[in-house]
C-alpha cells in the first residue's frame, strides 16, 4: 500500500504583517508543524488565501516551505485554477521549485462538464508528471467531480488522491466502490467529519485545525488505525471545531495562528478578521482545549 501520506496533512495559512508575507513567521509555523507530527504540508490552497496571493508570492512561500521541510514530509502545492494552461504553468513551476505533489481544485465560475474535468485534470497531469491530488469542494466551486469521473481519473498514473470536501458519506462510498484504495488515497477536506471518514476507510485529512493542533489531530488518526474507538478522544477537538465554525475559513483559524505567534491577525480583502468579541471567544476555546490536555 503506497499513499502520498496517511493521517494529517495541514492546509497551511499564510502569515501577513502589514499586508506583506512574513517569512520568519511562516518558518516558525512550519517548524511547529514538523515538530508536532504533521504528515504533509499543503501550500497555497484555500486556507492560504491563494486567490489574493501574487504568482511571485506563491512561489516565494512554496520555496521557503520546501527548503525548510527538506523532504521530511511531502509538500503539496495548490496550483489549480479554472484555466487549464495557467494551471499547467503553475504546476510546472511548482515542480521546478521541488514540490512533491500538486493539488488541483475543480474549475470554478466558468466550470465545465464531467468530460471537461477529465480532459482538464489529465492535461495537467500529463504535462507535469508529478503526483496529483484532486480537490473536490462543491460548496466553493459549484462543481463536483462525480464518482464515475474519479474512477476514470484514478487510472491515470499521476493522479493519486482525492481531497473530498463534500461532507457527503454517500459520495465517499460511491467513490470507494470505483477505485483501488491501495493506490489511490481518499482524504477528508472537513475536519469535523474525520471520525466517520476514518471509520469508512479514509486515509487521512487535509486539515485546517491542524494548523494549531497538529499533534492532537494526528494522534486521533493513529488511535483509529490502532483499532481504538476515537469518539471520546474527538469530543474536545469537536468543541474547538464548533468554535472555529463562527465564520468562513480561513478567517477563524488565523485568529488562532496569530494567537500562537505565526504572524499578525491579518487577512487580505475581501476577507476580514472576526469581531473582537468572536476572536476572544475563539481564543478562549483554544485555551480551554489546551488546558484540558494537561488535566
Swiss-Prot record:
Record carries keyword Cytoplasm: yes
Binding site for pyruvate: 47, 206
Family matches, as Pfam families: DHDPS (PF00701)
EC number, UniProt record: 4.3.3.7
GO MF terms held by the record: 4-hydroxy-tetrahydrodipicolinate synthase activity
Cysteines paired by S-S bonds: none
Keywords, alphabetical: Amino-acid biosynthesis, Cytoplasm, Diaminopimelate biosynthesis, Lyase, Lysine biosynthesis, Schiff base
GO biological process terms held by the UniProt record: diaminopimelate biosynthetic process; lysine biosynthetic process via diaminopimelate
Reactions mediated catalytically: L-aspartate 4-semialdehyde + pyruvate = (2S,4S)-4-hydroxy-2,3,4,5-tetrahydrodipicolinate + H2O + H(+)
HAMAP family referenced in this protein's UniProt entry, alphabetically: DapA
Protein role: Catalyzes the condensation of (S)-aspartate-beta-semialdehyde [(S)-ASA] and pyruvate to 4-hydroxy-tetrahydrodipicolinate (HTPA).
Subunit structure: Homodimer.
PANTHER family registered for this protein in UniProt: 4-HYDROXY-2-OXOGLUTARATE ALDOLASE, MITOCHONDRIAL (PTHR12128:SF66), DIHYDRODIPICOLINATE SYNTHASE (PTHR12128)
Family to which this protein belongs: Belongs to the DapA family.
Protein name, UniProt field: 4-hydroxy-tetrahydrodipicolinate synthase
Lineage, opening ranks: Bacteria, Bacillati, Bacillota, Bacilli, Bacillales
Amino acid at each position: 500500500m503506497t499513499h502520498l501520506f496517511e493521517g494529517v496533512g495541514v492546509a497551511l495559512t499564510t502569515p501577513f504583517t502589514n499586508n506583506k508575507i512574513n517569512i520568519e513567521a511562516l518558518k516558525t509555523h512550519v517548524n511547529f508543524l514538523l515538530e508536532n507530527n504533521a504528515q504533509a504540508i499543503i501550500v497555497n490552497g484555500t486556507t492560504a488565501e491563494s486567490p489574493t496571493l501574487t504568482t511571485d508570492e506563491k512561489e516565494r512561500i512554496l520555496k521557503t516551505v520546501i527548503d525548510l521541510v527538506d523532504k521530511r514530509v511531502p509538500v503539496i502545492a495548490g496550483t489549480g485554477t479554472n484555466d487549464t494552461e495557467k494551471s499547467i504553468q503553475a504546476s510546472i513551476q511548482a515542480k521546478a521549485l521541488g514540490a512533491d505533489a500538486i493539488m488541483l481544485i475543480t474549475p470554478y465560475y466558468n466550470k465545465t462538464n464531467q468530460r471537461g474535468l477529465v480532459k482538464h485534470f489529465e492535461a495537467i497531469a500529463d504535462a507535469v508528471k508529478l503526483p496529483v491530488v484532486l480537490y473536490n469542494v462543491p460548496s466553493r466551486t459549484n462543481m463536483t467531480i462525480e464518482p464515475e469521473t474519479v474512477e476514470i481519473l484514478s487510472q491515470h498514473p499521476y493522479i493519486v488522491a482525492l481531497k473530498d470536501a463534500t461532507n457527503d458519506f454517500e459520495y465517499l462510498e460511491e467513490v470507494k466502490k470505483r477505485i483501488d484504495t491501495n493506490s489511490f488515497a481518499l482524504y477528508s477536506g472537513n475536519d469535523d467529519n474525520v471520525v466517520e471518514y476514518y471509520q469508512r476507510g479514509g486515509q487521512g485529512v487535509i486539515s485546517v485545525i491542524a494548523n494549531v493542533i497538529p499533534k492532537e489531530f494526528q494522534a486521533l488518526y493513529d488511535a483509529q488505525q490502532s483499532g481504538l474507538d476515537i469518539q471520546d478522544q474527538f469530543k474536545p477537538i469537536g468543541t474547538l471545531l464548533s468554535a472555529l465554525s463562527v465564520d468562513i475559513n480561513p478567517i477563524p483559524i488565523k485568529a488562532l495562528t496569530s494567537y500562537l505567534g505565526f504572524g499578525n491577525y491579518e487577512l487580505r480583502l475581501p476577507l476580514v478578521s472576526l469581531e473582537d468579541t468572536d476572536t476572544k471567544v475563539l481564543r478562549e476555546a483554544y485555551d480551554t482545549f489546551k488546558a484540558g490536555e494537561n488535566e
